[in-house]
Amino acid sequence: MFNLRNFDVIVVGAGHAGTEAAMASSRMGCKTLLLTQKISDLGALSCNPAIGGIGKSHLVKEIDALGGMMAKAIDYSGIQFRILNSSKGPAVRSTRAQADKILYHETVKKILKKQNNLLILEAEVKDLIFKNYSVVGVLTQNEINFYSRSVVLAAGTFLGGKIHIGLKSYSAGRIGDKSAIDLSVRLRELSLRVNRLKTGTPPRIDINTVNFNNLLIQNSDTPVPVFSFMGNVSHHPKQIPCYLTHTNEKTHEIIRKNLDKSPIYTGFLKGLGPRYCPSIEDKIVRFPDRKSHQVFLEPEGLSSIKVYPNGISTSLPIEVQEQIVASIKGLEKSKIIRPGYAIEYDFFDPKDLNLTLESKLIKGLFFAGQINGTTGYEEAASQGLLAGLNAALSSKNTEGWFPRRDQAYLGVLIDDLTTQGTEEPYRMFTSRAEYRLSLREDNADLRLTEIGRKLGLVNDSRWIRYNQKVLNIQTEMNRLKKNKISPISPDADILKKLYNINLIKEISMSELLKRPQIRYQDLQSLESFRTGIVDLEAIGQIENEIKYAGYIKRQSEEIERHLKNENTFLSSICDYNKIRGLSSEVVKKLNDYKPISIGQASRISGITPAAISILLIHLKKESYKHTL
C-alpha cells in the first residue's frame, strides 16, 4: 500500500518525458507518483501522429533497449511503417511510423496501469517544496503537499504556455488545456536561467473532404518494420497509406499577402521556433525562389476523421488558413476541423543541469523534455527515461548514470544540451553523432540492455530474449568464419555466374559476406552454407558487423583515444581563477559550466586547445604533488 503523501520520486507532467520517467523510477523499485492535469491525456501525441524519423528512431530503439515503452506503444498503434534512408548505409537508416493517436494513448495508459510502484493522480502542481537547497516535494493547486526524495519536472509546453492564432493569443498548455501559470511564476523566482521558445502545428482537416485521387500514395514498407526488440509484426494494427501533395504559387501568394497578420512577423511572438520544422510562413520567407513545398497527408488514426497535413504548420488567422488549404491540390474542398497555431512556452537553460539531468543548483530536482529546449516526442521520452532512472538512484543515495557520446544517441543529446546549451528547439539527427557507425538502430540493445539490466530497468523476458540474440550472433559469426568455399566447388561456379566473383583460393563465408554485392540470404542459396539462423535481427547485426568491420575497428580505436579525455576528470578543480595562463573568458566559462572532464570541457564553445593544454598541465602538476 502507498502512503499517499510520501514517495521516493514525484514526476510532474505525463507527456512522453513524464511517462517514461515514471516508468523508469517505478521499475527500479521506487514508490513513484505521476501528477498530471488530465489522466485522459497520458502520453498524448499532441502534434504530429508519428514516432521516429532520422536520428529520432535511434533514440526510440535506445529507450526500448533500456526497458522503456515508446517502441512497444508504437508497435501496437502504428498504421504505417517505413525505413528512411534505406538506400544508404546502416548508420543512418531510420524507422518511422505513423500512429493511430487513440491507440497510442490507450497503449501507454494500459502499460502504466499495469506498472507496480506507480500511482497516477490528477492534480496541477503550483509550487515545489524545498529544504536546505534540496527539493523535498510539491504543492498542488488544491493545497495538498506530496513529499519525495526527488522530483522530475516534465511539463512540456505547459509552463507559461501561450497559444497564438493570428494576432490573437491566450494562455494554454496546448489547445484545449490550461497553462501552468503558477508553477511558471514560481520557477522564475528561483536562480534558474529561463527563456522562451515556440513551436507550431498545422490545421487538422476532415478526411471526408479530401480528394485523394491523383495524389502520390505512400504505403508501408514490405516487410513491415518493427520498432521494439521485443516486438513482432503481428502486434501492428491494420496498415493504411499516407499521401503526398504540394503547395503552389497560389498558396505562396496567399501567405505573402497575409504576413502582416502573422504573430511571428509582427513581433507578437518572441520565442525562436524549430529550425528543422519551420512554419509554412517561414518556408515562404526563407526560400522565396521555391515554387512548391511538400505536404504529407497523414491520417490521425483508423477511426479518426482528422488528417494531419505535415508541412503547413501555421499561426495565421483561421480565415487565411482556410484559403491556404483550399489552394492545395486534393484539398480544394476540404474543411478545417481544428486550426493550426503557434505556442510559446518557458524553457530552462540545460547548461544548468548535470549529465544526469539533475539541477546543478537544487539537489534532487531533475528536468526532462521540452523544458530543456528540445523538440520532439523521442527527444522528450529519452530524457524522461534518463531523468527518471537518475531520480530513482538519487532517492536511494546512489551515484547517477548517463551514457557517453560513444555509447548512445541519448549520450550525444544530453552532452550537447548540458555542454553547449541551445537557443532554439534542439532536434536529434544522425549527423550530430560523431560515432554513428557504432550507434546504429540494430545494435541499440547490444549497447545498452546489459546496463539497463544492472540498473533494474530490464525485466526477465527481455533479458532472456537479449541473451538468445547475443548467442545467435556469436554462434553464427563463428560458423561463418569456419565454413569455407573451395575455388573448385559447385558453389564457386554459382558465385561466378550470379555475382561475377571469381575465386582463386579458398574463402570463408565470413570473408564472402564482406563483399558489397553479397547478402546473408545470398549465402543461403549455396550448397556449403548448410543450416543458418532465422533470427532476422541477428542476421542484420551479423551483416553489419562483418561488412563494416574495418570501419568499426577504426572507430573503436578513435573512441579509445577519446575516452582518455573523457576519463580525465576535473572534479579536483574548484576555482579556475587559480589556474595561471587561462584567459578571463575561458575562466568564466569553465566556472559557469563546471565540466566534469577534459573531454566535456573541450566541447564548450570558446574553450581553445591551448586552454585544454593548460588544464592538462595543471592536473599533471597536482597529481605529482600528491605523489610526494
UniProtKB/Swiss-Prot annotation:
Domain of life: Bacteria
Localization: Cytoplasm
UniProt binding sites for FAD: 13-18
Binding site for NAD(+): 273-287
MF terms in GO: flavin adenine dinucleotide binding
Pfam families: GIDA, GIDA_C_1st, SAM_GIDA_C
GO cellular component: cytosol
SUPFAM superfamilies (UniProt xref): FAD/NAD(P)-binding domain
Co-factor(s): FAD
Gene Ontology annotations of biological process type: tRNA methylation; tRNA wobble uridine modification
Gene3D superfamilies: FAD/NAD(P)-binding domain, GidA associated domain, C-terminal subdomain, tRNA uridine 5-carboxymethylaminomethyl modification enzyme MnmG/GidA
InterPro entries: FAD/NAD-bd_sf (IPR036188), GIDA_C_N (IPR049312), MnmG (IPR004416), MnmG-rel (IPR002218), MnmG-rel_CS (IPR020595), MnmG_C (IPR026904), MnmG_C_subdom (IPR047001), MnmG_C_subdom_sf (IPR044920)
Keywords: Cytoplasm, FAD, Flavoprotein, NAD, tRNA processing
Reported function: NAD-binding protein involved in the addition of a carboxymethylaminomethyl (cmnm) group at the wobble position (U34) of certain tRNAs, forming tRNA-cmnm(5)s(2)U34.
Similarity annotation: Belongs to the MnmG family.
Quaternary context: Homodimer. Heterotetramer of two MnmE and two MnmG subunits.
Name this protein carries in UniProt: tRNA uridine 5-carboxymethylaminomethyl modification enzyme MnmG
